[in-house]
From Swiss-Prot:
Biological or metabolic pathway of the protein: Purine metabolism; AMP biosynthesis via salvage pathway; AMP from adenine: step 1/1
CDD domains referenced in this protein's UniProt entry, alphabetically: PRTases_typeI
Keyword Cytoplasm: yes
Gene Ontology MF terms: adenine binding; adenine phosphoribosyltransferase activity; AMP binding
Role: Catalyzes a salvage reaction resulting in the formation of AMP, that is energically less costly than de novo synthesis.
Reactions catalysed according to its record: AMP + diphosphate = 5-phospho-alpha-D-ribose 1-diphosphate + adenine
Enzyme Commission number(s) from the entry: 2.4.2.7
Taxonomic classification: Bacteria, Bacillati, Cyanobacteriota, Cyanophyceae, Synechococcales
Localization per Swiss-Prot or TrEMBL: Cytoplasm
Keyword Methyltransferase: no
GO cellular component, one term: cytoplasm
Similarity comment: Belongs to the purine/pyrimidine phosphoribosyltransferase family.
Protein name in UniProt: Adenine phosphoribosyltransferase
GO BP: adenine salvage; AMP salvage; purine ribonucleoside salvage
Length: 171
């Protein structure tokens, strides 16, 4: 999908100096490209081998929701602090430009064993690693990670013991 490269905008020094932020939102403004991407992502073995999908706050929700709809599988939300009600499983993580934490509703994991993780971008792997640790700590299996963009120089995929599929690899 060569066109993806044209639809990813780069913002220098965002959210802080030294970070080149890759923005995937323009993909959604091109429905034919978005649909083609979702169909490709949805056909991945990572998705077919999972009982449920787990998407990461917030841009991962865009792709995760569309894939969930396409394959009729449940989607679980990994959210930033203060966004989810109920009993939560929380974990802190470090990312390229700071520290944060993610929460998942405990009851949302109860009925499923295997999960595909979906996000918009893989950089250092901190966010995905946080989600994978929550899942593993709760006895769950990860079928893999699907991401639109992968920043290959940051070698995020090297942190994982599960498959990673990305549709656009950038420096």
């Amino acid at each position: 999908m060569e066109i993806l490269n044209e639809l990813i905008s780069t913002y220098k020094d965002h959210p802080k100096e030294g970070i080149d932020f890759k923005d995937v939102l323009e993909i959604v403004q091109h429905p034919i490209v978005f649909k083609e991407l979702i169909l490709k992502m949805a056909s991945s073995k990572i998705v077919s081998n999972a009982e449920a999908l787990i998407s990461i706050d917030a841009r991962g929700f865009i792709f995760g929701s569309a894939i969930s709809f396409q394959v009729s599988k449940p989607m679980i939300f990994a959210r930033k602090p203060g966004k989810l009600p109920g009993e939560l499983i929380k974990k802190k993580y470090t990312l390229e430009y700071g520290e944060n934490s993610l929460s998942i509703q405990k009851k949302s994991l109860n009925n499923f064993y295997s999960f595909a993780i979906i996000d918009d971008l893989l950089a250092t792997g901190g966010t995905v690693n946080c989600v994978s640790n929550i899942l593993k700590d709760n006895g769950k299996k990860i079928t893999g990670l699907l991401t639109v963009v992968e920043l290959i120089e940051l070698e995020g995929r090297s942190k994982f013991d599960f498959p990673v599929e990305s549709w656009l690899k950038c420096k």
